Amino acid sequence: MRKSFYTWLMAQRNPKSNEPVAILADLAFEDSTFPKHTDDFEEVSRYLEDHASFSFNLGQFDQIWEDYLAH
């Protein structure tokens, strides 16, 4: 079974980085309602589009998701 996206994303945290994955990781870490136990693209994407307490470029999210799938 694949690690959840959130678990993988937390390994990408780096407050000193300007890389999109590090920025998303920090934003997700601060968002208590971010879906933490899923590896489903649609669920995470829908959350970012409709419910996130922050704004993030969804084009960058697509690339981050591809990186997640590659690991």
From Swiss-Prot:
SUPFAM superfamilies listed in its UniProt record: YozE-like (SSF140652)
Xref: Pfam families: YozE_SAM_like
Disulfide bonds: none
Family per record: Belongs to the UPF0346 family.
Name of the molecule in the record: UPF0346 protein stu0441
Originating organism: Streptococcus thermophilus (strain ATCC BAA-250 / LMG 18311)
